[in-house]
Amino acid sequence: MAEGGFTHNQQWIGPEEAEELLDFDIAVQMNEEGPLNPGVNPFRVPGITSQEKDDYCKILQTKLQELKNEVKEVKIEEGNAGKFRRARYLRYSDENVLSIVYLLIGYLRYLIDHRSLGSLRHDIDIETPQEEHYNNSEKGTTLNIKYGRRCCISTFIMYLILFAGVGIWLGARAQVVWRLPPLVVPVDDTEIIFWDCWAPEEPACQDFLGTMIYLKANVNISIQEGPTLGNWAREIWSTLFKKATRQCRRGRIWRRWNETITGPLGCANNTCYNISVVVPDYQCYVDRVDTWLQGKVNISLCLTGGKMLYNKETRQLSYCTDPLQIPLINYTFGPNQTCMWNTSLIKDSEIPKCGWWNQVAYYDTCKWEEANVTFQCHRTQSQSGSWIRTISSWKQRNRWEWRPDFESEKVKISLQCNSTKNLTFAMRSSSDYYDVQGAWIEFGCHRNKSKRHSEARFRIRCKWNEGNNISLIDTCGTNPNVTGANPVDCTMKANTMYNCSLQDSFTMKIEDLIVHFNMTKAVELYNIAGNWSCTSDLPKGWGYMNCNCTNGTDNSETKMACPKNQGILRNWYNPVAGLRQALIKYQVVKQPEYLIVPEEVMQYKFKQKRAAIHIMLALATVLSMAGAGTGATAIGMVTQYHQVLATHQQALEKITEALKINNLRLITLEHQVLVIGLRVEAIEKFLYTAFAMQELGCNQNQFFCKIPPSLWSMYNMTLNQTIWNHGNISLGNWYNQTRDLQNKFYEIIMDIEQNNVQGKTGIQQLQKWENWVGWIGKIPQYLKGLLGSVLGIGLGILLLLICLPTLVDCIRNCTNKILGYTVIAMPEIDDEEVHLSVELRRNGRQCGISEKEEE
C-alpha cells in the first residue's frame, strides 16, 4: 500500500499487530533503569471501538513501522533492547532544555541588536571653562540619562507586573497533595503482610516462619485458624530436632562395625559368620543435643514489602524485631489427640471434638494462657552412690569425694520441686517414641554458681505415673472403674513438693531408626552431687493451652470424665501463640504515598508560631501513630526513620543491580523472589499512574503537587478547616481524618488513566514530540558520516604532504620530457673560482660547437 507515504516494500500494520508492537515498546522501556517513561497502550483502553483503533493505526503508522524494524533488529542477548534512552531523557528534562534554548535565543538576540541598541546613545560633550560651575538644574538632562531612566522604570514595572502575575497564578485556589510524607501510619486490616525470618545458622527459622501465614495485619496482631494441635506440635518438635542435628548426617557419620561369630567347632565347615553393621555415630548427636536441651532459640522476624515495625515501648521504627527467645519446651498430649482450633473441621461423629479415646470428656475451647508460674527445686544428698579417694587440688592431700550412682533408679527421684500455682495436666498413653507415659511437666531450672557447684541449667521432668501398676494409663481422675486406667490426680498443687528427675535421656526417631540417647555422662559434668537448689527460668510469655473440659452425653462409667475443679492444661509450645505474645508490643506501620494537606502548608513562614506541618518537620517530631499528640512523642524516631528509608532504598538498588547484571540468575531464595515481585509490582503501578500524575501537574521529583480546581471540585473534595485548626493536629490523626480524601484522589488518578480522551490527547502530544526530536535518533549515523569524512580528509592531506616533493619532481620531469629539455646539474664551486656557464643542449647540441658545424 502507498497510503501515508509508504513504499511498496512496507506493509500496512493493523490494530492487532500494532497492539503487540506497542506492548513491545513498553516492555523495552521497562528494561531500563528508572525512572521510566510512562507508556500507555491505546489499543487496550476499555471501551475502544474498531474505528478508533483504525484511527490510531493511521496516526501511529510511522512509529509502528519503526517499531517493527526495531523488533527485527533487537537481540536480547546482545543487550541492545533499550533504544529510546536519549528520547526518554529529553522527555523528562524538556523543561530544562527549553529554558536553555530560550536563554540562548535571548543572548543571540542581544548580540544581534547590540550595535543598533548602541546607536541610541547620543553623547554630547560640551567644553566649558574650568572656572565655571553649574548646578544640576543648569546641567539639564541628556538623552542618555533620559533613556536610561525610562529603561529602568519600564523594566521595574515590567518585572513587577510579571511577579504579580506569577504570584496570582501560584496563589490560585488549588488542592495541595503531599507525596511520600515523612510519617508512618498503621496498616489496614485487609493488607497482606510478608514476613521473613533472620537467625544466622538457625534452622528453626523456617519452622516458625511457616506459622506466620496465620498472622494477619491488625492493630493488635491476631491469629487465624490453625492446624491440628497435636500433629502440629509433634511435627515441630521432630523437625527442630532433625534440623538441629543435621550436621550429624554429613560427612563421616556412619561407622562400620565388623564382627565374626564362630560356631561350636570354630570356623570349620564354614560355620563362621562375618557380620558387618553400619551404625550412626551418636556422639555427634549427643554433643548437639546437650546444648539443644537448654531449650532456647534466638530468632528475629522481619517485614518485607516496605512495611515497618513500630515498638510501642521504645517508640522506635525497625524492619526486624528484637531477638526473640523461643523456648523449645516439650508438650503433653493424650493418645489419639484430635483437638483442633476449629472443632467444626472434624466430620467424623465417632471422633470426640477435642479429647481422647476411652473417655467421655472432651474439650470444646482451647486458648493460650500465660503461665506466670515459678518452679523451685532442691536436692539433698540421699541417693545411692560410693565414696572414692581422689586428690584434692585445694588441700594438697587425698580426700574422699562422693560419686552418685547414675544407673540407680533413686537418682531420678532425687529432686523435689514445687510450683506457685495449681496446674492440672492432661494425660497420654505414650510420647512421640515411647519414652514416657502418663502426664508430666517439663521446665528449665537454673542453678547459680556457688563455692562447691558451678553454674548450670537443668531440664527437669515431673510426672505422675509412679503408681503400683505403671503399665496402666494415667487418666488424671479418681474413678477406678475406667478400663485399663491407673487413676491418679494429675493436678500439681501449689506449694507442694513432688518427686522429679533430671531429663538425662530421651528417645527420638532418626530417619528409620528409633534411637535412645543416654545423657548420663553429660549430666554428670554438671556436678549434681551434693546439696543445691535451682529456680525455673521460664522466658516471659511462656504458657499453656488452657482447655475447658465438658462431659459428653454418654453416661458410661467405664470412661474417664473431666476433672472436678478446672480444665486441662496442655504443656506445649504453640508457635503462633508464642509469636503473638512476643509481637504484642509491635505494630505494623507503613509510609503513605499521598497526604491531602491544606494550602496553608505552602504559605508557611518560619517566623510564624502556629504548628503547621513544616514546624513538626523542622522540630523533628515526626508523629507516627494515630492518636499521638503534637508534642515530642516521637523525637527519637526521626534518625532511625531516615536510616530505615536509606536501608530500604539501598536494598532495592542492590536488587535492581542484581537483575541487570545477572539477569535473574541470583534470585533463587524465596524472600528475594518476594522482594523482586514487590519491586515489579511497584514498577507497574508507577507506569500506570505516571501519566495521570503528569496530567495533574505532579513531577516525580516534587514533594508537593497542586491539583487544578476543576478536577478538585468535580469530586467534591473539601477539607474541614476546623479539624486542621492551623496545623494543631498530629499527622496520624490528620491522616485518619482525610482517609476518604485519599481514596478520592486515587479515583481521580484512575479516571484520568482510563479516560479515552485524555489518553488520545497524550498520544498525539507524544507523537508531535517524537516528530520534533526524531532527528536525535539519527545522531549516531550523522556522527559516523562526519567522523568518516574528517578522517578521510585528514588522511588525504597527510598523504599529500608526505608525497608532495616526489609528486612535484615527477610532474617537472614529465613536463621537461614532453618539452624536450633536460636539466643538467653542475657541481657546486667556490666563490673565488670563475663561474662556468651552463647551457642547455637541444637535440644533441654540444658545448663549443656552432650550429653550422653541428649540421
Swiss-Prot record:
<feature type="glycosylation site" description="N-linked (GlcNAc...) asparagine; by host">
    <location>
        <position position="518"/>
    </location>
</feature>
<feature type="transmembrane region" description="Helical">
    <location>
        <begin position="785"/>
        <end position="805"/>
    </location>
</feature>
<dbReference type="GO" id="GO:0020002">
    <property type="term" value="C:host cell plasma membrane"/>
</dbReference>
<feature type="glycosylation site" description="N-linked (GlcNAc...) asparagine; by host">
    <location>
        <position position="531"/>
    </location>
</feature>
<keyword id="KW-0175">Coiled coil</keyword>
<dbReference type="GO" id="GO:0005198">
    <property type="term" value="F:structural molecule activity"/>
</dbReference>
<feature type="glycosylation site" description="N-linked (GlcNAc...) asparagine; by host">
    <location>
        <position position="330"/>
    </location>
</feature>
<feature type="glycosylation site" description="N-linked (GlcNAc...) asparagine; by host">
    <location>
        <position position="736"/>
    </location>
</feature>
<dbReference type="GO" id="GO:0016020">
    <property type="term" value="C:membrane"/>
</dbReference>
<feature type="glycosylation site" description="N-linked (GlcNAc...) asparagine; by host">
    <location>
        <position position="269"/>
    </location>
</feature>
<dbReference type="GO" id="GO:0055036">
    <property type="term" value="C:virion membrane"/>
</dbReference>
<feature type="glycosylation site" description="N-linked (GlcNAc...) asparagine; by host">
    <location>
        <position position="716"/>
    </location>
</feature>
<keyword id="KW-0165">Cleavage on pair of basic residues</keyword>
<feature type="glycosylation site" description="N-linked (GlcNAc...) asparagine; by host">
    <location>
        <position position="548"/>
    </location>
</feature>
<feature type="glycosylation site" description="N-linked (GlcNAc...) asparagine; by host">
    <location>
        <position position="298"/>
    </location>
</feature>
<keyword id="KW-1133">Transmembrane helix</keyword>
<feature type="glycosylation site" description="N-linked (GlcNAc...) asparagine; by host">
    <location>
        <position position="481"/>
    </location>
</feature>
<feature type="glycosylation site" description="N-linked (GlcNAc...) asparagine; by host">
    <location>
        <position position="728"/>
    </location>
</feature>
<feature type="glycosylation site" description="N-linked (GlcNAc...) asparagine; by host">
    <location>
        <position position="469"/>
    </location>
</feature>
<protein>
    <recommendedName>
        <fullName>Envelope glycoprotein gp150</fullName>
    </recommendedName>
</protein>
<keyword id="KW-1015">Disulfide bond</keyword>
<keyword id="KW-1043">Host membrane</keyword>
<feature type="topological domain" description="Cytoplasmic">
    <location>
        <begin position="806"/>
        <end position="855"/>
    </location>
</feature>
<dbReference type="InterPro" id="IPR000328">
    <property type="entry name" value="GP41-like"/>
</dbReference>
<feature type="glycosylation site" description="N-linked (GlcNAc...) asparagine; by host">
    <location>
        <position position="422"/>
    </location>
</feature>
<keyword id="KW-1160">Virus entry into host cell</keyword>
<feature type="coiled-coil region">
    <location>
        <begin position="735"/>
        <end position="771"/>
    </location>
</feature>
<dbReference type="Pfam" id="PF09590">
    <property type="entry name" value="Env-gp36"/>
</dbReference>
<feature type="glycosylation site" description="N-linked (GlcNAc...) asparagine; by host">
    <location>
        <position position="499"/>
    </location>
</feature>
<feature type="glycosylation site" description="N-linked (GlcNAc...) asparagine; by host">
    <location>
        <position position="448"/>
    </location>
</feature>
<keyword id="KW-1032">Host cell membrane</keyword>
<keyword id="KW-0946">Virion</keyword>
<dbReference type="GO" id="GO:0019062">
    <property type="term" value="P:virion attachment to host cell"/>
</dbReference>
<dbReference type="InterPro" id="IPR018582">
    <property type="entry name" value="Envelope_glycop_lentivirus"/>
</dbReference>
<keyword id="KW-0261">Viral envelope protein</keyword>
<feature type="glycosylation site" description="N-linked (GlcNAc...) asparagine; by host">
    <location>
        <position position="720"/>
    </location>
</feature>
<feature type="glycosylation site" description="N-linked (GlcNAc...) asparagine; by host">
    <location>
        <position position="274"/>
    </location>
</feature>
<comment type="function">
    <text>The surface protein (SU) attaches the virus to the host cell by binding to its receptor. This interaction triggers the refolding of the transmembrane protein (TM) and is thought to activate its fusogenic potential by unmasking its fusion peptide. Fusion occurs at the host cell plasma membrane.</text>
</comment>
<feature type="coiled-coil region">
    <location>
        <begin position="642"/>
        <end position="692"/>
    </location>
</feature>
<feature type="glycosylation site" description="N-linked (GlcNAc...) asparagine; by host">
    <location>
        <position position="372"/>
    </location>
</feature>
<feature type="region of interest" description="Immunosuppression">
    <location>
        <begin position="661"/>
        <end position="679"/>
    </location>
</feature>
<dbReference type="GO" id="GO:0019031">
    <property type="term" value="C:viral envelope"/>
</dbReference>
